């Protein structure tokens, strides 16, 4: 998926819109197949509200697994060219900003969706930004601590 926003999906050349993904997910679910989805947060042009709404919409579908990760700018890609030409088009989260956003997402999605991953880390020699230097298990520990500090949990604000 990468995003539930059709404009963003066109920009990143996904070759489908949300309606096609939704139809495919529903058709696959009818056959009893476990379905996983994937979202990248902070794609250029996507607002915080759009990303949050997209995660909620996606989790209203019959998915069982969700992978999340931050946008990474990797050397040698079209995205890297765009970033180097005009970094103002990008809002790359700091680690704490991303942690807070993931908490917002978790609070609003179904509690039965298995969250498989929260961050991705490209090898440092290929990564332009963001340079967090953190592995998924380290982020997960920080996330667990933040959830505990806030006395919140997955699905707490699901309407």
Regions inferred by a protein language model and the residue ranges of each:
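Active-site beta-loop-alpha junctions enriched in small/polar residues
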Residues: 1-4, 40-44, 71-73, 118-122
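Conserved non-cysteine loop/helix-boundary elements of the Radical SAM core domain that shape
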Residues: 1-32, 41-61, 79-96
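A structural motif corresponding to the C-terminal end of an alpha-helix
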Residues: 23-35, 61, 100-114
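Short hydrophobic alpha-helical runs that function as membrane-insertion/retention elements
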Residues: 35-38, 67
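Auxiliary Fe-S-binding modules of radical SAM enzymes
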Residues: 65, 72-159
């Amino acid at each position: 998926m990468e995003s539930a926003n059709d404009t963003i999906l066109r920009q990143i050349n996904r070759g489908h819109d949300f309606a096609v993904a939704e139809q495919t997910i529903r058709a696959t679910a009818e056959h009893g197949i476990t379905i996983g989805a994937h979202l990248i947060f902070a794609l250029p042009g996507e607002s915080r509200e759009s990303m949050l709404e997209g995660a909620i919409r996606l989790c209203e579908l019959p998915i069982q697994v969700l992978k999340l990760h931050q946008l990474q700018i990797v050397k040698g890609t079209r995205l890297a060219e765009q970033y180097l030409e005009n970094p103002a088009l990008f809002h790359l989260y700091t680690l704490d900003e991303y942690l807070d956003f993931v908490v917002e997402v978790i609070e609003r999605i179904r509690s039965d969706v298995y969250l498989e991953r929260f961050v991705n880390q490209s090898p440092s020699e290929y990564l332009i930004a963001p340079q967090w230097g953190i592995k998924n298990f380290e982020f997960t520990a920080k996330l667990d601590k933040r959830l505990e500090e806030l006395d919140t949990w997955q699905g707490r604000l699901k309407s």
